């Protein structure tokens, strides 16, 4: 049994087309729907994303993901955390790059995730394959006392700590730690290293990505 992620715009019937997709960001309900627009439009008041109705399912998903990063920054007011007029949702080039990297979650050949485990054994961000290892016991603890993991972007490794100070770390914290390190990987591979300096922003994205993907996950025998 393996965890996979379903493209919500991919119809189950070949003769049909998915015209709208609903999902949550935090406590907010958003609807992404096809419309007669040239470029993707976001209405933050009505919480509606309008996507060019000529796009296929893969392109529609790409636009949804791009909008997702923008909406997270807006709804959680992450821009206030960035100095010197930089933006938490980054510029258009970085946004496109992040969306491209994140879209790999919908290709099950780019990650190895067994059913009923907290996180995958490995995953790909662009051309870089990251492998995830559990560390049984360490004396290291972050200053926040919440995240228990570390990323090595040169070797493509993520270490998740299982025990600290002789106490088991709960599954929920290990899961959050993985997504936290995953967001670090996204920012690094998108050449947006400065975003890694603000742990609150990384954690905010990590939480929302985890919830976003959870809404579109399924399981297959593989």
Predicted ranges, named:
Residues 62-75, 176-188:
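Active-site recognition of the HExxH zinc-binding catalytic motif
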Residues 9-62, 74-91, 109-172, 188-189, ...:
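Active-site scaffold of zinc-dependent metalloenzymes
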Residues 109-110, 219-222:
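Long, well-structured alpha-helical subdomains associated
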Residues 2-3:
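Basic/hydrophobic alpha-helical interface regions
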Residues 104-105, 214-219:
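Long, highly charged low-complexity segments enriched in Glu/Asp and Lys/Arg with interspersed Ser/Thr
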């Amino acid at each position: 049994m393996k965890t996979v992620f379903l493209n919500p715009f991919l119809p189950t019937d070949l003769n049909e087309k998915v015209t709208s997709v609903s999902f949550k960001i935090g406590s907010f309900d958003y609807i992404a729907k096809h419309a007669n627009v040239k470029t993707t439009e976001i209405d933050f008041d009505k919480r509606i994303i309008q996507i060019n109705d000529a796009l296929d399912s893969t392109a529609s998903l790409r636009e949804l993901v791009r909008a997702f990063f923008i909406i997270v920054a807006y709804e959680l007011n992450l821009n206030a955390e960035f100095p010197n007029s930089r933006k938490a949702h980054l510029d258009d080039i970085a946004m496109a790059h992040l969306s491209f990297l994140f879209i790999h979650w919908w290709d099950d050949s780019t990650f190895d995730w067994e059913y009923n485990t907290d996180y995958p054994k490995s995953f790909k961000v662009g051309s870089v394959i990251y492998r995830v290892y559990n560390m049984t016991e360490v004396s290291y603890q972050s200053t926040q006392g919440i995240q228990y993991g570390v990323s090595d972007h040169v070797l493509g490794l993520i270490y998740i700590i299982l025990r600290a100070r002789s106490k088991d770390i709960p599954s929920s914290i290990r899961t959050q730690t993985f997504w936290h390190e995953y967001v670090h990987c996204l920012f690094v591979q998108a050449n947006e290293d400065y975003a890694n300096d603000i742990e609150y922003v990384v954690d905010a994205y990590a939480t929302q990505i985890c919830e976003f993907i959870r809404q579109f996950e399924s399981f297959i025998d593989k």
